[in-house]
């Protein structure tokens, strides 16, 4: 009669792996490029090009009635038209029946959630590309790294503030008033600035920076917000735009769009803005073995006032 201990070395578990009931989180970058844009809607059946119009203000020169009976010269009213073309984007996932049959996880539900995440991320990147291609950026010169452009500085930020205020741009974010709390400070009514996470260390070094944790009131703050400098509140994302190897020493140049109210617009198509769908196996496959999930959405984008948006090109401090 044999003796010994029965253990996992001589009797391995029938199921060598155990499935955790909780999935690990799927990475998702900060979505910072859409929330500051004005939202417009396009009606169905009247074309894909959406026209947004603005009447320009009248001249304030002259206009005095001097008693001569001569009327002031009439002025022609000027209207500025900005067009946005609605575009459609889509993504599909084809799933074999064996995955659905044998996977422990509810894959169709999870894959649908992934497509929903794709919708939000794709929209954000499209708005990022609009800012990257349609804004006049000014090189930072106030830094100390000796590059062209330099890292971001208070003087550079003040220069963009001067430009926007000189063009009568309106701020987007309200004042956060001072409170009787240690190590906090108020924020002014502010414009929005969008930055890459690579320059967060440089933002901490900017003169007068107020990090988000030092705001007196944390209610309603977006997770993507990083800090406040002068009249700008900075929001950061790992996917914010940059130009590879464009600096004088071959390092990346980061573009930071900075804007006020009604500087940009996002157009959503009525009845088509975001669609998540499912096609069953008997439709997708001749032997009914593959099903399909899909997501699609329509979006139009435009810079609506070039005078109310500017930005900085910057590098990082060495």
Where are the regions that the model predicts?
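Structured loops at beta-to-helix junctions and adjacent beta-edge loops in soluble globular domains
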Residues: 45, 53-56, 96, 196-198, ...
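Alpha-helical scaffold segments that mediate packing/assembly in large oligomeric complexes
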Residues: 102-178, 317
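Aromatic- and glycine-enriched pocket-lining scaffold segments that form the walls
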Residues: 175, 180-200
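Hydrophobic alpha-helical segments involved in membrane association or supramolecular assembly
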Residues: 52, 113, 117, 193, ...
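N-terminal "assembly arms/tails" that initiate or stabilize quaternary assembly
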Residues: 1-85, 309, 316
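Sequence/fold signature of self-assembling virion shell proteins
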Residues: 2-33, 146-172, 191, 198-318
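Short, charged/polar micro-motifs that form catalytic or ligand-binding hotspots
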Residues: 42, 98-109, 113, 183-190, ...
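Short acidic, glycine/tyrosine-flanked loop/strand segments centered on an H-E-D-like triad
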Residues: 76-103
